[in-house]
Regions:
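K/E-rich alpha-helical interaction surfaces of small helical-bundle regulatory domains
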Residues: 71, 177-180, 247-254
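Acidic/polar loop patches that form or flank catalytic/metal-binding clefts of enzymes
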Residues: 4-14, 71-76, 104-111, 120-122, ...
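A generic secondary-structure signal for well-formed alpha-helical elements
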Residues: 2-8, 64-72, 80-88, 98-105, ...
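Beta-strand-rich binding/interaction modules
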Residues: 105-108, 116-214, 327, 331, ...
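Structural beta-strand/beta-sheet cores of well-ordered domains, especially the beta-sheet scaffolds
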Residues: 59, 94, 119-125, 132-134, ...
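Long, ordered, helix-rich scaffold segments
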Residues: 23, 50, 202-552
């Protein structure tokens, strides 16, 4: 993470980290496979290499650095190498080095390594216009997880700022009497440590209503619960100085609309909310700035993100339909700006992998995607022309991806031409297979079964399995098909792979980790497939471990 941040854009890398964490680790924490970063026990060591151990584990080190500061962290790393190089070091050995370098007791922080689950941090705010104060009530809660019904409060570093109604950042002046000396020093650098279940803070000398800019830089792996108005989110999307908060404001606004649409698809659309959201995006696009960041702002939350937000009784078809409609809304509302971006960002210069060039390509391809979502008849020729004339694989794959989201003849022509051109390149054919497996349309499962019978596919090739079958398992709409065909297909593949490659079989089986979130019919169908797998006497220890925990 840090290497890429230093070499490319720190903001874009951080957003990518957060997307990965939420998609993989938050989902793991919310299901039957939840476990701590350092589990007390395990049944199969091959199942130890999880998003929790790796992705959440990285976030703990990031939090540690934030809590003790860069200098103390650097000294602690050096001390760790001096003390522990060549030894079987433990988490306790690791943390002891940072206690020595910082003078801080990290026993409470160590609970992050022991306790499973994603904490929720709630911020309740009250502004007193007469007193010119803002009162914040902070609270944290971690839900029960398998084997850990009771949770303790954690040390949560909450990076925070205040934004005025004009979009300017305001100084943090708090009632310092409520803090000890260490906490007052942390507040000066925009940090509040939430170490108990609740904490009350009052900011003073605020002559205007403010917007709270919380969890800057995604300072902790938590779910933030905050009752921001649409107006507040629009302000943050346009003016917040922290890129993560700006991006999160757009994500939160879109999520609000998408969750409402998925929960009550027949109740009508929130036209005023959609108009306000698209206007906020228009202002962000018109402001210019880093093209790569603008591309992130324009990318809606994924179907997995929306399902996780809904939490239970999830209907993947309703989520897909709502997301497609909102993508089309954004494309129509911003069609003039998007078409201008698409044309202005075209380049005849030789391909360069530098960050600036990559950002321009990302924004141009995002514009193409939204334009095609809004008007398939107009966007498809643009995508086909880009596919034909692209000077680099990024642009050609982006155009093919857009075409694969349509059901046009141009899609099939482009797929055939792509295959003929790159049939001898294994890595590119992996991508070709994956694109087809992730098509959201009916008939995708039949297409995948057909591709499995071609010479390009072999169950003995893990990369091919990950690309085609793993791609389908990640296809939220088709894997969760209401007739259970997606569950049956992946379950059959798990059983076929298990005797030969249980590690890959387990990765496919992880697609079932959120089965309890589905609406009742899908729940029953997914459970039936899991119990069928569980009933096979010859299962490997790897698959047996995951299926037993999934059904526990």
């Amino acid at each position: 993470q840090e290497f890429t941040s230093d070499q490319r854009s720190r903001a874009i890398q951080r957003i990518a980290d957060v997307r990965t964490l939420r998609a993989q680790q938050f989902s793991e924490d919310a299901g039957p496979l939840a476990h701590s970063v350092r589990p007390d026990t395990y049944r199969e060591i091959n199942n130890f290499y999880t998003a929790t151990v790796y992705e959440k584990g990285a976030e703990l080190v990031r939090m540690l650095k934030m809590l003790i500061g860069d200098d103390a962290f650097s000294r602690g790393i050096q001390l760790y190498f001096e003390r522990c190089d060549g030894t079987a070091a433990t988490v306790e050995d690791f943390l002891a080095c940072f206690e020595a370098s910082s003078g801080r007791d990290l026993q409470h922080f160590a609970l992050w390594y022991e306790q499973a689950g994603t904490p929720s941090v709630t911020i309740a705010a009250s502004y007193d216009q007469d007193a010119k104060t803002l009162s914040l009530e902070l609270s944290q809660e971690t839900p029960p997880t398998p084997g850990q019904p009771d949770k303790k409060p954690l040390v949560i570093p909450l990076a925070i700022g205040l934004i005025g109604e004009s979009g300017t950042e305001l100084p943090l002046k708090a009632e310092i009497d409520a803090f000890d000396g260490a906490s007052a020093a942390e507040l000066k650098r925009g940090l509040i440590e939430l170490t108990s279940a609740r904490r009350h803070i009052v900011f003073r000398d605020l002559g205007e209503r403010v917007v709270i800019s919380a969890l800057r830089g995604f300072s902790a792996p938590v779910q933030l619960v905050q009752s921001a108005s649409d107006e507040d989110l629009s302000l943050q999307c346009a003016f917040d100085p922290d890129p993560c908060v700006r991006w999160q404001a757009a994500q939160t606004y879109a999520t609000r609309l998408l969750v409402a649409a998925a929960r009550a698809p027949a109740s009508g659309r929130n036209h005023s909310g959609i108009a306000s959201f698209t206007e906020a995006l228009r202002k962000a696009v018109s402001a210019g700035g880093d093209p790569a960041f603008t591309a992130q702002l324009l990318t809606l939350p994924s179907e997995t993100d929306i399902a996780r937000e809904i939490g239970d009784n999830v209907d993947p078809d309703a989520i897909y339909d709502g997301r497609q409609r909102l993508r089309a809304d954004v494309g129509r509302a911003l069609s003039t700006e998007l078409l201008r971006l698409y044309r202005d960002l075209a380049s005849d210069a030789p391909y360069s992998p530098d960050a600036a060039s990559a950002g321009r390509r990302a924004l141009r391809n995002t514009a193409l995607d939204l334009l095609t979502s809004a008007d398939e008849a107009a966007g498809t020729p643009l995508a086909r022309a880009q596919f034909d004339t692209a000077s680099n694989m990024t642009d050609r794959i982006a155009a093919l991806t857009v075409l694969c989201l349509t059901e046009s003849a141009a899609r099939e022509d482009a797929l055939e031409e792509f295959y003929k051109r790159y049939a001898g390149d294994a890595l590119i054919i992996d991508k070709w297979l994956s694109l087809q497996a992730t098509m959201p349309h009916p008939g995708t499962l039949d297409r995948v079964r057909g591709l499995m019978r071609t010479e390009q596919f072999s169950m003995a090739n893990p990369n091919r399995v990950r690309a085609l079958i793993g791609g389908f398992a990640a296809n939220q709409r088709q894997f969760n098909a209401p007739d259970g065909s997606g569950y049956d297909f992946i379950g059959e593949c798990v059983l076929l792979l298990d005797p030969k490659n249980p590690h890959v079989a387990v990765r496919l089986l992880s697609a079932f980790r959120t089965w309890r979130m589905m609406e009742p019919r899908r729940c029953r169908l997914a459970e039936a497939m899991l119990r069928r797998i569980q009933g096979v006497a010859s299962l490997s220890p790897d698959v047996r471990d995951i299926v037993d925990r999934s059904l526990a």
